């Protein structure tokens, strides 16, 4: 069975946002605080498609104060 990397990416970021109790609106505010300006539509599209860059992923993790990510497969 082939790995669906887009689905894994989407799941990874959504899990971390859920753990931090942060929705898209709050994420957008927090991203702006670190100098990253995104729209709701842009954030939702990137996350739901699972096609965001690793830079975007790191920015999101910084915005929710997540310093360590463990990927298990």
Feature locations, PLM:
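A short, Lys/Arg-rich alpha-helix, primarily the initiator
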Residues: 1-26, 30
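Short acidic DE-rich linear segments
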Residues: 3, 72-73
């Amino acid at each position: 069975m082939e790995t669906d990397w887009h689905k894994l990416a989407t799941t990874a970021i959504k899990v971390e946002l859920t753990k931090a109790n942060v929705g898209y609106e709050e994420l957008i505010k927090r991203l702006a605080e670190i100098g990253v300006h995104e729209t709701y539509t842009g954030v939702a599209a990137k996350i739901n498609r699972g096609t965001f860059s690793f830079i975007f992923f790191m920015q999101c993790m910084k915005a929710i104060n997540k310093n360590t990510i463990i990927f298990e497969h």
